[in-house]
């Protein structure tokens, strides 16, 4: 074990399961594409060969058979090109896996050599990866329309740091893009497309996502009064779900008739409406009983029967749809739902946080007549580099528990001054010497100055303490 | 020894994921080759057909050959495809599944308040500014600051602290140490000053200019080395001189490595001189998180089996052993009676015998100040009046 008490290599691998989960899934998906492509071409070739076969039987159709054979060669040629593209994909993924293994082998070497400097540097790149992951997941994206490649600050960071092989940013940004479209632009298209491409996985899991997304599409059509399209949507997409979600579908159908009344007759006395609303909720607990938001809450509900349509029109549905999507997306690739960076920060803060954190000593300082002394003490003595006390980190530590300590961790030679402050006696003496040397104070040989309240004591006043 | 990494590396990455590791040939690669071979075969048969198409017998042979090679091709494609997917499945089962022993999400019990996340953004800004300002695109400071702002939204005020450092590092990496040497002189940093000159001498020798190197040592390093207190520095210089004498050189990679050491030393010194934190707070927190993770997952595993719950609400139920440089920021006093950390509400008190207890335990021992009590550590008797509130102060 080295001086950092860092976990072993295998533990690090487990912490970074997503670095291997994603490529493993990608390999399988790439294989699926490869296989599908081959199968479809194989069927086509089967047909072509059959025609060629009959053509060859007829000696008069010499030219035609040569032509057919040419066609076949062309088909095979195209197949080869398309397959080798997928094969290149495969090699890229495999290379990533190899680079990642190399990354952890590096760590293994540093750990084996107990090389703390190198280990710290390695952990810095590890931190950078977590930051990159966070930025890619949440950054706002810009799309390069020429190459159709989305980018954001996270990807920029990955590229400047040369971390491309250690993080599957393409996957993360796909989730980010779909989710941003949902939340920011209320655009369902990318989500529906994704659902279609991954329907096998979703049905296997028995996910509600597809139904909820289609339902939302229908609701939006109703909202913009395109009833024809809404009915078409209901018939083609939603009707299959009649057995699984009968209640929701009844509501959805009802909304078509009552949507206008939901919006128009809302204004008379709000309070009683709200009471009715709650009453209705308890009678029919089909959705989460949260207050209706924004537009809908003010004007929906004239009578209690209508208010049950409220949740369908609620804009919070977008939020929950987004959450549902992210859950499905991340579970598909076995990526953690919460941002890894936040998880590490939460654990890190809790491991570090002492009861003293956030209580700055500078507030207790009593100023000295010489401002230089104050300045020196402020920046050199009481200033702590404690990461939890850092002004950006401390607010994050708000709800997090403190570290648990079983032993006191103090300092050598504790002595108490008459004012009750306990210091390391040697450090206190050397501090006073330094202040004298710099000409800030004129202390006598056996005198020290308490840096907090600036009172001066003789070293003979020191009381040796026995804290346990 | 790490078993997972070894399996991943030896058994899979270096063999089983490939048909031939040295050529980086995979099963799918084999498929592509088979398609190619098939195409060539078809072309050959086409040539035959063109040449001998008129003879019915030959036509028959060609027909059969075509059918046969199509059939063979199809079956070998299927075979390769099957072994490809089964390799992946085995890989996933043997290598990837064991990594999923626990879920990262499962230890995320104490959540960070989402309303405070904009503070995290600033922490990220500071992190990037501290370590990577020198990678910002641009030739002038202004361009670099603009780049950092437009790419990461890092405000000028944060990046400003590091821009001088970044410029010096940039110069150092481009082979010009002069600004850094001047900076060292201004700040009286003898050791780094020496290291930089030494680096210059090294690079002269690696460029195969022994005479220049010798003269450089004479003018720039000799005076420092001759000081008797700097024996430590004499050793590398004498090694360099010896290399000159025997006509040896230094590989460029060594010079680069030493340059990085110097950059690291310089940034450290720069932060010290300018009262900037040595490491970004975010980095230290994440590092503590990695170290703590092992205990959290262990606790989570035990909790699952034994149905114990996360006991104390505001304190972790276990101790995380952090390295000294991460655990010495604040003095921690654990009351020896209550075994609790002292706080503002429950501060430490000194007894007349100079043992220290927390206020709560003092109240308990003295029955709220109504009676005398014996110090739990020595025979001295005490009363509450005789105790004195103390505070522990850590000096750097």
Swiss-Prot record, chain A:
The keyword Zinc applies. It is found in: Cytoplasm; Nucleus. One of its GO terms (cellular component) is nucleus. InterPro entries: CTLH/CRA (IPR024964), CTLH_C (IPR006595), Fyv10_fam (IPR045098), ZF_RING_GID (IPR044063). GO terms for molecular function: ubiquitin protein ligase activity; zinc ion binding. Belongs to the FYV10 family. Residues 171-229 form the CTLH domain. The keyword Nucleus applies. GO terms for biological process: negative regulation of gluconeogenesis; proteasome-mediated ubiquitin-dependent protein catabolic process. A zinc finger (RING-Gid-type) spans 386-453. This is Protein FYV10. Keywords: Cytoplasm, Metal-binding, Nucleus, Zinc, Zinc-finger. It holds the Pfam family CTLH. It comes from Kluyveromyces lactis (strain ATCC 8585 / CBS 2359 / DSM 70799 / NBRC 1267 / NRRL Y-1140 / WM37). Involved in the proteasome-dependent degradation of fructose-1,6-bisphosphatase.
């Amino acid at each position: 074990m080295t001086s950092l008490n860092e976990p072993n290599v295998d533990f690090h691998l487990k912490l970074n399961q997503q670095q291997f989960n994603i490529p493993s899934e990608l390999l399988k998906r790439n294989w699926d594409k490869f296989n599908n492509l081959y199968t479809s071409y194989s069927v086509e070739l089967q047909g072509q060969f059959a025609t060629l076969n009959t053509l060859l039987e007829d000696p008069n159709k010499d030219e035609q058979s040569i032509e057919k054979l040419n066609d076949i060669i062309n088909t095979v040629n195209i197949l080869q090109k398309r397959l080798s593209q997928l094969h290149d994909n495969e090699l890229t993924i495999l290379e990533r896996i190899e680079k990642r293994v190399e990354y952890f082998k590096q760590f293994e070497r540093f750990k084996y050599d107990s090389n703390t400097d190198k280990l710290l540097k390695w952990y810095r790149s590890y931190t950078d990866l977590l930051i990159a992951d966070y930025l890619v997941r949440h950054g706002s994206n810009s799309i390069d329309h020429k190459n159709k490649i989305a980018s954001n600050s996270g990807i920029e960071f990955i590229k400047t740091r040369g971390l491309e092989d250690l993080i599957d940013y393409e996957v993360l940004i796909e989730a980010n893009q779909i989710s941003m479209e949902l939340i920011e632009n209320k655009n369902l298209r990318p989500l529906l497309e994704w659902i279609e491409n991954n329907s096998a996985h979703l049905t296997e899991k028995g996910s509600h996502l597809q139904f909820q997304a289609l339902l939302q599409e229908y609701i939006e059509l109703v909202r913009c009064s395109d009833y024809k399209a809404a009915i078409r949507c209901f018939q083609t997409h939603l009707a299959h779900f009649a057995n699984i979600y009968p209640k929701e579908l009844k509501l959805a159908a009802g909304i078509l008739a009552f949507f206008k009344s939901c919006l128009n007759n809302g204004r008379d006395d709000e309070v009683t409406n709200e009471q009715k609303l709650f009453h209705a909720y308890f009678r029919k607990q089909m959705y989460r009983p949260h207050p209706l938001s924004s537009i809908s809450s003010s004007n929906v509900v004239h009578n209690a029967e209508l208010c049950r349509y409220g949740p369908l029109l609620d804009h919070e549905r977008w939020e929950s749809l987004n959450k549902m999507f992210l859950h499905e997306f991340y579970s598909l690739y076995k990526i953690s739902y919460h941002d890894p960076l936040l998880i590490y920060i939460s654990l890190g803060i809790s491991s570090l946080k002492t009861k003293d954190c956030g209580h700055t000593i500078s507030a207790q300082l009593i100023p000295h007549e010489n401002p230089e002394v104050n300045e020196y003490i402020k920046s050199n003595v009481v200033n702590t580099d404690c990461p939890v006390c850092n002004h950006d980190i401390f607010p994050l530590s708000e709800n997090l528990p403190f570290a648990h300590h079983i032993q006191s961790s103090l300092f050598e030679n504790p002595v108490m001054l008459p004012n009750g402050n306990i210091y390391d006696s040697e450090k206190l003496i050397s501090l006073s010497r330094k202040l004298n040397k710099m000409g800030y104070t004129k202390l006598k040989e056996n005198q020290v100055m308490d840096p907090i309240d600036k009172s001066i004591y003789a070293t003979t006043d020191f009381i040796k303490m026995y804290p346990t | 020894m790490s078993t997972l990494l070894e399996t991943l590396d030896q058994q899979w990455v270096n063999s089983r994921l490939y048909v031939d590791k040295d050529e980086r040939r995979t099963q799918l690669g084999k498929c592509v080759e088979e398609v190619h071979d098939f195409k060539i075969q078809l072309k050959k048969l086409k040539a035959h057909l063109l040449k001998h198409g008129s003879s019915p017998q030959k036509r028959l042979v060609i027909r059969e050959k075509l059918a046969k090679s199509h059939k063979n091709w199809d079956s070998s494609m299927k075979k390769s495809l099957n072994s490809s997917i089964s390799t992946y499945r085995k890989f996933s089962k043997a290598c990837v599944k064991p990594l999923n022993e626990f879920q990262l999400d499962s230890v995320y019990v104490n959540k960070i308040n989402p309303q405070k996340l904009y503070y995290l953004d600033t922490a990220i800004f500071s992190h990037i500014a501290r370590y990577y300002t020198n990678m910002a695109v641009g030739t002038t400071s202004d361009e670099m600051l603009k780049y950092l702002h437009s790419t990461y939204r890092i405000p000028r005020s944060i990046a400003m602290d590091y821009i001088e450092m970044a410029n010096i590092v940039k110069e150092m990496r481009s082979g010009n140490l002069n600004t850094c040497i001047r900076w060292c002189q201004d700040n009286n940093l003898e050791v780094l000053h020496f290291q930089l000159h030494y680096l210059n001498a090294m690079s002269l020798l690696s460029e195969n200019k022994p005479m220049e190197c010798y003269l450089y040592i004479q003018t720039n390093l000799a005076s420092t080395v001759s000081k008797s207190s700097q024996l430590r520095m004499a050793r590398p210089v004498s090694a360099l001189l010896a290399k000159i004498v025997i006509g040896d050189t230094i590989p460029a990679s060594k010079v680069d490595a030493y340059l990085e050491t110097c950059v690291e030393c310089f940034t450290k010194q720069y932060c010290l001189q300018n009262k900037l934190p040595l490491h970004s707070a975010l980095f230290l927190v994440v590092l503590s998180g990695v170290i703590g993770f092992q205990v959290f997952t262990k606790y989570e595993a035990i909790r699952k089996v034994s149905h114990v719950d996360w006991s104390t609400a505001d304190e972790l139920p276990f101790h995380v052993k952090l390295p000294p440089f991460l655990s010495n920021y604040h003095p921690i006093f654990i009351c020896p009676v209550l075994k609790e950390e002292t706080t503002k509400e429950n501060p430490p008190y000194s007894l007349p015998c100079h043992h220290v207890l927390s206020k709560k335990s003092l109240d308990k021992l003295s029955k709220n100040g109504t009676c005398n009590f014996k110090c739990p550590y020595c025979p001295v008797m005490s009363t509450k009046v005789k105790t004195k509130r103390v505070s522990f102060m850590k000096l750097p």
